Structures are given as C-alpha cells and as structure tokens.
C-alpha cells in the first residue's frame, strides 16, 4: 500500500510527496546532522521486530486485558483532517477509515496488542481462534463465537460472512482490498469478479468448493494455492462482517450496521460524526477492544497545524481530545520534542512505508551491475530525510522491509547508516571499472517543494561520483501514472510502499515479481529475476509465518546485493499528541498511529 491514507493505488503516493506527511521543515538538518541519536528508533525497531504470532482459542477469549488506571465513561473529542469517504467495510482501505473501523467493525480475526501496546498477536475476533489450516494451507476453517450480534441485535452467523465475501465480487464494492477475492478465484487483478459478477444480489453464490458454510457457526475457505497469510488478510478492516439482512448495497457505505463496541449515532459528511455505545456488543466475546469511552465526538477539517495547536494548548475540551490520525505539524514538532510536558503526552513510531530510489532496468546503460552499484553507493539519502522533516519524521532505510513488518531484520549493504551522504569515492571506482564515467542519468522527480529539495541534493551526490545527472520534473498529480509506465523515460526515480499487513508477502511480490510488469503495476524498477520469481512462489507456499519471514529477508538481501535494482532511502515515522485528560494513549504499530481501542478519560 501507499503512504497517502494507505491506498494501494499508486497515484495516491503522490499526495505524500506533495506534503501529506506534513513533517517537512524541522529536525535540525536531517540524517547525519540531527541531535536525535537514533536510540528511540532502535527501541521502536526492536519492539517491532518481534514475530507476530497466530493465537489459539485461549488468546482469542475476551474480555480484553485491562489498561492500568483506566475507568469507564466520558466523552473524547477527536480532531480529524479528512472526513470519512467510506463506512462500508468492503470499501475501507485508508488509514483514517481503518482507525474508525477498529471501533465500529469486527472481522473473523484481528490484532490483539499486549499490555504495553507493543507486541501483537493475531487472534480470533468473531472467530474462536486465528484459524485452522489443512490441506497444506489451501483450506482454512473458522468457527464463530457464541453471543456475537450486530448493533441492531441480529445474531452474527456464517451466512453473514458468506454474504460479506460474496458481495466483494460485485460492483457495489470498488475501493477495498482484493487479496481474499483473488485467492478464492485464483485470478490476478480484477479478473476475480468473473467468479461471481453480481455478488449474492441475484441469488447466485460461490460454490462450496470455494467458500463453504456447512452450519451457522462454520466458515471454510478453499484456495487453489497455500495461503499462510490468511489470518493477516482477514484482520484487515476491509474483511469485517456485513449484515446480510441489513445490507443496503451502495447506501451501506454511509450507514452500516456495526458490530464493534460503538455505533454511529450521527454522521454529517465533511462536518462531524458521533459514536455512542453499541449495547449489543458483548465484551466477553472481544479480546481486542477495551471500549472505556462512552462517546466519541469527531469533527473534520482540522489541518495538522490546527489540531497540533489545540492539543498543545490543552485547555477546555482540548484536555480530553486527540486525533486518531493527525500528526504533529512541522512548526510544532520541535516544540513537542523539546518540552518534557508535551513530550510526555506524545507518542511516536514507525509507519509501514519505505522509500526507495528505483533504477530502471529496461534502460540498456543500467544493465551493467557495476553502474547500478555505483548509483547505490553514490546516492545520498540525507537530502531525502531532510526534505521530509529530519530524523523525527524519517529514519535511514538500509533495507526494503519496514521495521513494522513481522520478522524485520536490520540490513544496510550500501552503508547508508554510516555514510548517509553517500560514498562517491567507492562509486567512482565502480564507474571507472565499467568505463562509464560521465554517463548521463535522467532523474525524474515529483514537482513539489520536497521533491525539488531532495532531488537537488541527490543529484549533487551522484555528480560527485562521475554521473551527468539531468533532473526532470514530473507533475505531482500524475507522478505515479508516469513512473509506473513500462516505457517511461527515466533512469532513476523515487517511490514509497508499505505492507498491507505485517508480512513481507505484501512487499516483495508486488514490487519485485517480474511477472507483474505492466503499465500501472508497482514493479517500478522492472526487475525480472528468475531466482526472485521462483522464491516468491516458494515462500508464498510456506504456512509457518516465522519461517516465511526469514525467507523474505533473504530475498531482500539478494535484491540489494546481487540485483541492485533499488536503493532504500527512508523508513517513515510520525509523532502524535493527546490532551492531558486522556489515558491509555499508545502508538499502535499495525494501525500506524494512536490506538483508539484502549483510550479512557482520566
């Protein structure tokens, strides 16, 4: 997925480069020059390296572990920049909507944070556990819990889940994730819709050999290929349960029947939303959500500067306020970092996104690996870090896999952490060996203030190594339309990508599978390496998550050391702040922001 709200659609990344990250003017000089010594980054990375486990029935039993000092009651004010475009689970794929969904929707599985809010386990949410695989991971069986109901009091049964998944094949759903649909159909892209083009709305159903509900409590998925990541995928908000009885098709997107601890009392698009308790939610069935707060009053159109100013002021209703997604803006970030009182009310962590400089392997001049290695060693990453706010907004990336991904291991084959300004001497030697000193490089960059800044700095570093760099701007609104073309004219250009769930299976295949090369796809460097392609097929068949994570890390190392089609630049981070009257404020590594489920009013 991409940084702007989490959409996979490639065009959305351009919004981050245009300023959506917001942290663009502070940090004391960026990589190599900031006062930040990286200790907090190392702590965050260490906590996020832990392998996410798949929980059993005991781990999936509610209620959620209590938060120390928490009490029930009160109202929390929530300042959001953007209104919610989608409330139908099937259409939810952006981070702000996912945060909301964690309060109002439930699925078969979900992420349970430990008492500190740091480690996570995939547990059964509406199901009794994280799933039972059979047939080598091609079949997964889920049993529903007792006492689970929608907000209207209707019991949740397997028929609702059949309806939930079948409607995803129809044109009612156009914006959400498509992993499970594609797996069930065993078809790439939008071809999955052919399996059930009208969804369940004209009386047709998926065959029992694909999706079976033999009784009211059992849901069975049948895949043609092993799907060891299914518990991860089902934990996405986009696969939360939809009421078969209450489905209003397109209208459901504005007024869904909820299943979480809250229901929507009122929603005025672009203005406000009020959440109140769902009296039919049973905490004994829920191992994930504490739901201490009685009411959430959400208002929209709060730019980062506005929400930061209000929360820093900590007066009136601001004392019991926060934002699920808004970050501390650039102007106030240094203030929050410098003031002990403000710092105590802030949380921070990595987001799932990794920046990378792509080397276009379709270009004849770039087929020489010595030239590619020269680019990799020469490229300075410090201009990119500085452009997006310095060390508080970005950490130097040594690898292609984010610290938020389960099983992450540190990597830095090009020595960027030791030499963020690049190593032009080593690069020039490689260029001399290749006989390519003075070689022209066409550098396509996004035409934003940040793009201007980092491309200038990076170009200077490449020139020191002996490249003739020609910078060419690309309009921000069409940036990813342009660079995702197979025959684009650029030798190097920057992109960013984040895992859809904490597994590198949502990083390596979409970005580096040579069989995915086509206009609009995300294999931006157009790498088509037989070993990588074979490894992708092999690892996708591994059902042991820890073993798969180890193997994905090996592919990461191979790509960087033997293929050299990309150069990692930065791991994205963010800082958020809450009013002093709010307790239970923790940074959730999966949501990539404050966890709404643990909050309470002091």
Predicted regions and their residues:
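Structural transition elements
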Residues: 392-430, 450-453
């Amino acid at each position: 997925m991409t940084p702007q709200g989490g959409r996979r659609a490639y065009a959305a990344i351009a919004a981050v480069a245009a300023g959506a990250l917001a942290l663009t003017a502070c940090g004391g000089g960026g990589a190599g020059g900031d006062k930040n010594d990286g200790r907090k980054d190392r702590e965050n990375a260490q906590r996020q390296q832990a392998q996410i486990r798949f929980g059993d029935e005991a781990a999936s039993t509610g209620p959620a572990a209590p938060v120390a000092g928490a009490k029930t009651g009160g109202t929390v004010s929530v300042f959001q920049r953007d209104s919610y475009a989608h409330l139908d689970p099937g259409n939810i794929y952006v981070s702000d909507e996912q945060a909301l969904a964690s309060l109002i929707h439930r699925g078969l599985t979900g992420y349970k944070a430990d008492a500190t809010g740091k480690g996570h386990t995939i547990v059964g949410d509406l199901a009794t556990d994280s799933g039972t695989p059979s047939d080598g991971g091609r079949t997964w069986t889920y049993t529903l819990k007792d006492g689970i109901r929608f907000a209207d009091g209707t019991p949740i049964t397997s028929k609702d889940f059949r309806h939930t998944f079948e409607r995803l094949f129809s044109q009612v759903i156009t914006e959400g994730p498509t992993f499970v649909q594609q797996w069930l159909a065993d078809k790439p892209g939008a071809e999955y819709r052919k399996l059930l083009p009208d969804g369940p709305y004209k009386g047709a159903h998926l065959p029992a050999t694909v999706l079976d509900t033999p009784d009211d409590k059992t849901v069975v998925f049948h895949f043609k290929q092993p799907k060891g990541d299914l518990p991860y995928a089902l934990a996405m908000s986009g696969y939360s349960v939809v009421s078969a009885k209450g489905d209003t098709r397109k209208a459901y997107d504005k007024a869904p029947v909820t299943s979480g601890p809250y229901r929507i009392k009122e929603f005025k698009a672009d203005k406000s939303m009020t959440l109140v308790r769902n009296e039919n939610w049973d905490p004994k069935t829920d191992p994930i959500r504490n739901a201490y707060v009685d009411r959430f009053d959400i208002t929209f159109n709060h730019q980062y500067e506005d929400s930061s100013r209000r929360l820093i002021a900590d007066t009136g209703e601001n004392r019991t306020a926060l934002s699920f997604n808004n970050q501390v803006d650039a102007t106030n970030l240094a203030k929050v970092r410098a003031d002990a009182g403000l710092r105590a009310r802030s949380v921070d962590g990595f987001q799932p996104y990794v920046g990378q400089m792509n080397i276009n392997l379709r270009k004849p001049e770039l087929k020489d690996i010595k030239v590619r290695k020269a680019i990799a060693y020469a490229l300075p990453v410090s201009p990119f870090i500085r452009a997006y706010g310095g060390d508080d907004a970005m950490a130097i990336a040594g690898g292609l896999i984010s610290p938020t991904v389960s099983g992450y291991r540190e990597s830095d084959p090009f020595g960027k952490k030791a030499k963020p300004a690049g190593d032009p001497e080593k690069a020039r030697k490689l260029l001399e060996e290749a006989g390519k000193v003075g070689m022209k490089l066409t550098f396509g960059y996004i035409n934003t203030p940040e793009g201007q800044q980092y491309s200038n700095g990076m170009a200077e570093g490449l020139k020191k190594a002996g490249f003739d760099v020609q910078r060419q701007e690309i309009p921000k609104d069409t940036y990813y339309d342009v660079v995702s073309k197979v025959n684009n004219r650029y030798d190097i250009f920057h992109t960013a990508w984040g895992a859809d769930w904490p597994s590198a299976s949502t990083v390596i295949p979409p970005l580096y599978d040579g069989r995915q090369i086509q206009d609009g796809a995300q294999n931006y460097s157009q790498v088509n390496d037989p070993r990588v392609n074979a490894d992708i097929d092999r690892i996708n068949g591994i059902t042991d998550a820890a073993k798969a994570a180890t193997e994905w890390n090996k592919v990461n190392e191979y790509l960087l050391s033997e293929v050299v089609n990309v150069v990692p630049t930065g791991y994205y981070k963010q800082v958020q702040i809450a009013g002093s009257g709010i307790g239970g404020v923790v940074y959730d590594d999966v949501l990539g922001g404050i966890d709404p489920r643990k909050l309470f009013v002091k």
